[in-house]
A protein has these predicted regions:
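C-terminal motif of bacterial Sec signal peptides marking the signal peptidase cleavage site
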Residues: 3-6
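Glycan-recognition and catalytic cores of secretory/periplasmic carbohydrate-active enzymes
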Residues: 9-10, 20, 32, 36-37, ...
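N-terminal low-complexity, Ser/Thr/acidic repeat segments characteristic of secreted
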Residues: 14-15
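N-terminal leader/targeting and pre-domain segments
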Residues: 18-65
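Thiol-based oxidoreductase modules, predominantly thioredoxin-like and allied folds used
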Residues: 46-56, 72-77, 87-119, 671
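Loop/turn elements at helix/coil->beta-strand transitions in domains of secreted/extracellular proteins
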Residues: 65-69, 100-103, 132-133, 140
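Anionic-ligand anchoring segments at beta-strand to alpha-helix junctions in alpha/beta enzyme folds, i.e.
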Residues: 80-82
Length: 712
């Protein structure tokens, strides 16, 4: 014992002699989020945890302090992070541990997108499904040491998860100090080098399709086969609202050149999905909007979260479904989603916020029959109970609530238009609408009282704003209402002023460090999409010029020898070749850039060749897993089965409007050049097989490009 003690004493003396000089920067003694833009950062600016921004300077301070970084990666649209961070902040012992032992760093994985994408790889390495927020311990070099996804749970469970990892990491650090080793640094660096090599091999081993048109058809067959009308299930779609799949299927139903049976099958699958979704509780009948995901395997019980991007993606998909099906209810739902996004996510700057996911209890959103009867008059209560399919024992299927947590509870859903309900009640639309609005407001007031005050996100977000521009443009195309065109143009003007810094983009309307707020490749893809959408419906040439300028800048920032970089070099901290190929949280960068390429190329403004070569191929893995790559497949559909609208001189205002109202992204438009023989007053429609057709009236144009398939 004495010998051991003497040895420990001598080791301690040596360690003390060789211990590095530790400098604790003043910035680490306080919460450093301050006025950092973004909903996540603003929500934690007053936290007792000394959160620091994700910057090179923060990592340099971690090195000086001889501390590991304790990072939390979250995105504002994913629920759970606020409760997890609150559980940490409300535990004084945990706060002290975090502040005294680590450099705590909060990372918005939506804005710093490459970090958000990395969470998928990290979760896969420990054989866990992707779940945010993610706790990650890192060295000052940005090498992950340990990590764990944190499910939404009680404060005690969050504390236990932190303590377990903290204990392990602390013991490794203590062993290093006692034995004069650098195992933690060396091992994490070696692991990250292996990770770098693995990611590189994965991206370099991609097999590209040599027959993209045929493989496009094969992927559509497979996507359609995932839907089973008997069981009403959509295999591999998961629990998210399937906006991407719906959008692809609806556009495939309208795309000339595809085999008739594929178009017919796609239309039928789309209609069946609408039967499942439109009358479901995924659409909130009280406040509007669509919930982004469901709980379990039924659309009767949503995960009650709404963000701006999910509203807009669903709205655009439904607008395309309405084009294909002519269903009035689909259009009603789509325009309702746009109206809800305007109400819920418009910021004080007149732009749009991403939206903070709410973290309320499920029970607060559900109703018993008695609660409806208490809140409304007997007549109105009877109507709501019948229309929403409410039951005394509840309307949730047993497979959704196997433990009967929500016994006698009902979700609310309305599956018809107000005009249909008015006719069923034998009332005029005007009188029924007044009655409906009065009862809706009463129920909403009761629900809001249960939910309590919900924080509103007022941080203008470039991605959400560009998405809204595209939604307005799509709504104009479907309805022909000029107010939507005016909104699209006005919002894009505002967005360019707020989010463009010279030729580059930023995520927030306020200054932020590049690693926090510089535009990633994904944002450039969204901006190009919005600019091209507006260029299609507006006579102003500046939007096409801006889209081309954005493409040039993106090529300079994100082109590497072999892959499409997600982060510009001056914003990158992680030394990993991260690229965005899969629809992990949203559309993928690969899909957005591919779509921009085909649209610009058909307007005779091609991308830089090295950039174009990264954007145009169709990987075989996208064909084999279509549900995860619907955006890239849609771009391929537009490329391989392209339809080009070439306008001659002097076309009538009516024909010009008809060309503007065609499918924004699937049919490419341009003015005839001097070498093309397009008669004055006419439009030439050029198909992918080389055939063409000249038309002079809106009706002839419609017949040329949008003859719907027959039902199989």
């Amino acid at each position: 014992m004495l010998g051991s003690g003497g040895c420990r004493k001598r080791n301690a003396e040596v360690a003390e002699e060789s211990a590095p000089v530790v400098t604790l920067a003043a910035e680490l003694a306080t919460n450093g989020l301050g006025d950092l833009p973004g909903a996540i950062y603003q929500s934690q600016a007053a936290s007792p945890i000394h959160w620091q921004p994700w910057t090179p300077e923060t990592l340099a301070r971690a090195k000086e302090a001889n501390r590991l970084v304790f990072g939390v990666i979250a995105i504002p649209q994913q629920p759970g992070f606020q409760g997890v961070l609150a559980a940490l902040a409300q535990n004084p012992a945990l706060v002290s541990t975090i502040n005294d032992h680590y450099v705590p760093v909060l990372i918005d994985g939506d804005a710093s997108r490459e970090v958000g994408l990395l969470t998928g790889d990290l979760c896969s390495e420990i054989k866990r499904g992707l779940q945010l927020p993610l706790f990650v311990w890192m060295t000052y070099k940005g090498d992950p040491v340990a990590w764990i996804p944190v499910p939404k749970s009680s404060g005690g469970k969050v504390a236990d998860l932190f303590k377990q990892s903290h204990s392990m990491v602390s013991q490794m650090r203590a062993d290093d100090a006692e034995n004069h080793k650098t195992y933690v640094m060396d091992n994490s660096a070696a692991d990250n080098a292996a990770r770098r090599d693995r990611i590189s091999r994965r991206k370099n081993s991609k097999v590209m399709s040599t027959q993209p048109a045929e493989d496009m058809v094969r992927s559509l067959r497979q996507l359609n086969s995932f839907y089973d009308p008997s069981s009403r299930t959509f295999d591999e779609a998961g629990g998210l609202f399937p906006a991407g799949a719906i959008d692809l299927l609806a556009t495939a139903a309208m795309q000339p050149g595809l085999p008739e049976e594929i178009r017919s099958r796609s239309l039928e699958t789309t209609r069946e999905l609408m039967i499942d979704l439109l009358p479901s509780a995924m659409f909130d009948p009280l406040d509007g909007g669509v919930f982004s995901a469901r709980r379990g395997n039924s659309w009767t019980l949503p995960s009650f979260n709404r963000d701006c991007v999910s509203q807009v993606r669903a709205a655009v998909a439904l607008l395309h479904v309405h084009r294909a099906s002519g269903d009035a209810l689909v259009l009603d739902k789509a325009l309702g989603l746009i109206a809800y996004a305007e109400k819920a996510f418009t910021t004080s700057e007149g732009l749009f916020a991403a939206g903070l996911a709410s973290e309320s209890e499920v029970a607060a959103w559900l109703w018993s029959v008695e609660e409806i009867e208490k809140a409304l008059s007997p007549e109105d209560a009877a109507w709501w109970i019948k229309a929403a399919g409410m039951k005394g024992l509840g309307n949730l299927p047993s497979e959704v609530d196997p433990r009967r947590e929500f016994f006698r509870s009902n979700s609310l859903a309305l599956g018809k238009t107000l005009a249909t309900y008015a006719a069923e009640e034998g009332q005029s639309l005007e009188s029924f609408s007044l009655r409906f609005e009065a009862s809706r407001k009463k129920l909403l007031e009761v629900r809001n009282a249960r939910l309590g005050k919900v924080a509103r996100d007022d941080c203008s977000h470039a991605g959400a704003t560009f998405r809204m521009v595209s939604a307005y443009a799509a709504a104009f195309g479907v309805t022909g209402d000029p107010k939507f065109r005016d909104k699209a143009v006005a919002l894009l003007d505002k967005a360019r002023a707020a989010f463009a810094e010279g030729p580059k983009l930023r995520m927030f309307s306020k200054d932020a460090p590049k690693s926090v707020g510089a535009g990633r490749a994904f944002l450039y893809g969204l901006a190009m999409q919005a600019a091209l959408d507006v260029a299609t419906i507006s006579p102003d040439e500046k939007w096409l010029v801006w889209a081309e300028d954005l493409a040039t800048t993106a090529a300079e920032l994100f082109t590497s020898a072999e892959f499409l970089k997600e982060s510009p070099d001056d914003a990158r901290i992680l030394d990993l070749p991260i690229t965005d190929l899969v629809m992990l949280f949203d559309d993928s960068t690969a899909g957005l850039i591919s779509f921009a390429e085909v649209r610009l190329a058909e307007r005779e403004r091609p991308l830089v060749p090295t950039f174009s070569q990264l954007a145009t191929p169709l990987p075989i893995y996208a064909v084999e897993r279509p549900i995860l790559h619907t955006d890239l497949l849609q771009a391929t559909l537009a490329r391989e089965f392209k339809v080009t609208i070439v306008a001659g001189e002097g076309i009538s205002p009516e024909l010009k409007l008809a060309t503007e109202r065609l499918l924004l992204r699937m049919f490419q438009r341009r003015a005839a050049n001097s070498k093309e023989e397009v008669p004055a007053g006419s439009v030439k429609v050029i198909f992918s097989n080389g055939q063409s057709r000249s038309v002079t009236t809106p009706e002839a144009l419609q017949e040329a490009v949008l003859p719907l398939p027959k039902k199989s």
